[in-house]
Amino acid sequence: MTRARLQKPEEYARSAMKAIAANVQTIADEIDYVEVNSLINDLESAHQNKKRVFVMGAGRSGLVARGFAMRLMHLGLNVYVVGETVTPAVETDDLLIVISGSGETKSINEMGALAKAKGTRLASVTSNKDSTLGTISDTAVIVKGRTKVSGMDFMERQVIGSHISFAPLGTMFEISTMVFLDGVIAALMEITKKSEDDLKKKHATLE
C-alpha cells in the first residue's frame, strides 16, 4: 500500500530546511562557550607554537572534519586528516579534534585513547556528553542532534548494511557541527587578523 502524502515534496524540503535552521539557532543559544573557548584557545596555541592539528570523524562526520581541516589549512595551521596515507603519527603536544555524534564509534574512540596515551591533547565535538568520547576528551563541545545511541557503532552498521532511521538526527548533528566549526574559523580569523583574501592565497591551485 502506498502511503498518502500529507505534504507536497517541496513542502517537505522546506520544512526540513526550517527545522535544521532552527536547530542551529538553538545550539548557538545553548552551547557551552567555556568549552568553545577552550577549543579556540587550543587552536590558537597550535597556530602560534607551530604545533600539529589532527582531525578525525567517521562517515558524514568525517566529511565535516575534512571541511574544517581545509579551513584550518587556509588559516596557516599545520593540519592533517586522520586516515590519509600522508598523515604522520601523533606525538606529545599535538592536538586531535574528533567529531562523532554518538561519541561511541569504537574505532574513533580507540584512536582517541591511543592519541591521549601519547600525550596528545584531545578535543571533541559530540552530541552525547556522557559518551566514551565525551568522557575521555580534554575539551568536549556538545552539539545537540543525535540523542539515541545504537547498539552497533558506525562501522558495524556499514558492514552489515543496517541503516537505522537515524538519518534525520544524524543530519541535524552534522550540519549544526559544520556551522559551528565555521563559527570557530570566523573567531580564528579575528584572532589572527586574517582576511578572506589571506585565505584565498592558501586555496588549492591544483584541483
Question: Where do the model's predicted regions map?
Answer:
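Short, glycine-rich nucleotide/cofactor-binding loops
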Residues: 25-32, 98-104
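Conserved active-site and cofactor/substrate-binding residues in soluble primary-metabolism enzymes
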Residues: 11, 15, 19, 34, ...
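Glycine-rich phosphate-binding loops that contact phosphosugars or nucleotide phosphates
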Residues: 52-58, 62-176
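Glycine-rich phosphate/diphosphate-binding loops and the adjacent beta-loop-alpha structural elements
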Residues: 45-58, 206
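A short, well-structured juxtamembrane/interface segment
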Residues: 31-47
